């Protein structure tokens, strides 16, 4: 509903275009979610064929960030632009060394939940995890949802002593959960029991970025679930990271448009 109410201009990065990805972008526009702007090499896009607006560039990663910062679009999604390049350009445009992403997924039975960290270089320290939990909780509240955080670690409490690395994740999980509660966030440490966490939580915190990325891929590409995209957590702009594997971007465009609407509503309240 928020996406249709907003119908934002959403830029989508394009590399190696094919009919499946362009049709998914067209579907988002046809359903009224957004006015979609494709960002990539125009002759390659035209060869596949589309009626969508195209910004011609051989550097979609850079152009996406420029369009977002200049506010020529209301939101952007990575699409099939290169991950490392797009995120590096985004950091440079924002003047930040690090960014946090929060993924929105659906399980095979349609249960929605948020997940972090999802980048292999994210969430590898206690301070990183706490920052993600704090920013993630604020982000989730913008949807009118009260976050319930499920912190995961590498084993059960009874496994302490079997492996030093597992022991470390268990200790970190206990500490992170305690600090989150002190910050006024509803959080619980579920150890390695993700199957229990998903029953009670709507925000899953993985032990590190590698395991978070594996959870995302397992659910979205092997387990019959769906990954809508991973929003970069920031106040002034909307950027949704996407995986090139699935090839479907309709829901990511819908998410970006909805987030743009929420940002505009929040700015009205602030000002």
Swiss-Prot record:
SUPFAM superfamilies tied to this protein: Isocitrate/Isopropylmalate dehydrogenase-like
Sorted UniProt keywords: Methyltransferase, Transferase
Entry's EC annotation: 2.1.1.-
Enzyme class: transferase
GO MF annotations in UniProt: methyltransferase activity
UniProt superkingdom: Archaea
Gene Ontology BP annotations: methylation
Subunit field text: May be part of a complex composed of 3 subunits; MtxA, MtxH and MtxX.
Family per record: Belongs to the MtxX family.
Protein name: Putative methyltransferase mtx subunit X
The species this protein was found in: Methanosarcina barkeri (strain Fusaro / DSM 804)
Gene: mtxX
């Amino acid at each position: 509903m928020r996406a249709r109410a907003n119908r934002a201009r959403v830029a989508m990065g394009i590399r190696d275009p094919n009919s499946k990805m362009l049709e998914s972008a067209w579907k988002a526009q046809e359903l009224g979610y957004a006015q979609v702007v494709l960002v990539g090499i125009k002759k390659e896009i035209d060869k596949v064929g589309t009626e969508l607006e195209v910004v011609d560039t051989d550097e979609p990663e850079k152009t996406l960030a420029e369009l977002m910062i200049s506010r020529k679009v209301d939101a952007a999604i990575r699409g099939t632009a290169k991950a490392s390049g797009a995120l590096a350009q985004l950091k440079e445009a924002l003047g930040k060394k690090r960014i946090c992403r929060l993924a929105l997924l659906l399980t095979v039975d349609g249960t929605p939940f948020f997940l972090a960290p999802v980048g292999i270089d994210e969430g590898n320290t206690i301070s990183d995890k706490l920052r993600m939990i704090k920013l993630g909780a604020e982000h989730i509240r913008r949807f009118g949802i009260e976050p319930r955080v499920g912190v995961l670690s590498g084993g059960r409490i009874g496994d302490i002593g079997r492996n030093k690395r597992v022991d470390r994740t268990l200790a970190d999980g206990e500490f992170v959960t305690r600090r989150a509660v002190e910050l006024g966030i509803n959080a619980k440490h579920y150890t390695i029991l993700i199957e229990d966490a998903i029953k009670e939580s709507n925000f899953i915190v993985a032990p590190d970025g590698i395991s978070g990325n594996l959870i995302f891929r397992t659910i979205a590409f092997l387990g019959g679930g769906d990954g809508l995209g991973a929003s970069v957590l920031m106040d002034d702009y909307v950027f949704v990271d996407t995986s090139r594997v699935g090839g479907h971007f309709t829901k990511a465009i819908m998410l970006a448009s909805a987030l743009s609407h929420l940002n505009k509503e929040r700015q009205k309240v602030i000002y």
